[in-house]
């Protein structure tokens, strides 16, 4: 069984939590795309839901699948967000944003009563950091922002390299919000909650890919079946 099959299994398990009348946050990435496609099948079968996409890519996927969409300007609160993750640790802390949608993903997740994270078992780790940590930054003053980010790493006992994410034709990758992303290759993050706080205090940082205290449930699909982990 390949990873795409496992991702789809996790997405199908999360779909069991969806009921008619729900307002849903729709995540971004390969695993979240499986959820959107499966949700579309249910919608065509009569399920009545409305979704808020976390990226323009997800918006296009949802529209193609026939899912009715809205924005957070039009509704107060979401019942549930379903999204993937690049890493999940035993405290349900996450690294997200490998697809570049971390800002909208965090806004939507924070506006939800619950967040279910769907992933294959390879994303489950004891300590975050092997996957590069995305940090969304304003292009202005990038060198100063990078120095401040590196100082924050030192303060939590982490060390590594920052790399500006490449986009098309050799230019910097540009997020849906018009910002850039620097990826931090740290290997290990000793204190993710503290690092999240320090990064959020840097003026040039728009958002970072550490999701702390946001995920309610993680659904992990592996070769031996589905495992569900709830926040303690």
Curated annotation (Swiss-Prot):
Q: In which pathway does it act?
A: Carbohydrate degradation; pentose phosphate pathway; D-ribose 5-phosphate from D-ribulose 5-phosphate (non-oxidative stage): step 1/1
Q: Is Transcription given among the entry's keywords? A: no
Q: Which residues does the entry assign to the active site, renumbered to this chain?
A: 105
Determine the domain of life of the protein's source.
Answer: Bacteria
Q: What NCBIfam families is this protein classified in?
A: PRK00702.1, rpiA
The role this protein plays is: Catalyzes the reversible conversion of ribose-5-phosphate to ribulose 5-phosphate.
* Name assigned to this protein: Ribose-5-phosphate isomerase A
Native organism is: Rhodopseudomonas palustris (strain BisB5)
Q: What is the lineage of its organism?
A: Bacteria, Pseudomonadati, Pseudomonadota, Alphaproteobacteria, Hyphomicrobiales
């Amino acid at each position: 069984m390949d990873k795409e099959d496992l991702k789809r299994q996790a997405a199908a398990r999360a779909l069991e939590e969806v009921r008619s009348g729900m307002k849903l946050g729709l995540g971004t990435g390969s695993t979240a795309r499986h959820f959107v496609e499966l949700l579309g099948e249910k919608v065509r079968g009569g399920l009545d839901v409305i979704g808020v996409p976390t990226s323009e890519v997800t918006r296009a996927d949802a529209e193609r699948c026939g899912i009715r969409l809205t924005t957070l300007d039009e509704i107060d609160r979401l019942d549930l967000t379903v999204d993937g993750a690049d890493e999940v640790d035993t405290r349900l802390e996450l690294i997200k944003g490998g697809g570049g949608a971390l800002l909208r993903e965090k806004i939507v997740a924070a506006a939800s009563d619950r967040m279910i994270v769907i992933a294959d078992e390879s994303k489950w780790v004891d300590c975050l950091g092997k996957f590069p940590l995305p940090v969304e930054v304003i292009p202005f003053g990038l060198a100063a922002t990078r120095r401040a980010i590196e100082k924050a790493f030192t303060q939590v006992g982490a060390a590594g390299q920052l790399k500006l994410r490449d986009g098309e034709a050799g230019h910097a990758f540009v997020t849906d919000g018009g910002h850039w992303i620097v990826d931090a290759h740290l290997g290990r993050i000793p204190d993710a909650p503290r690092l999240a706080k320090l990064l959020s205090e840097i003026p040039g940082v728009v958002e970072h890919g550490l999701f702390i205290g946001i995920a309610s449930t993680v659904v992990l699909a592996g070769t031996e079946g589905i495992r569900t982990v709830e926040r303690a």
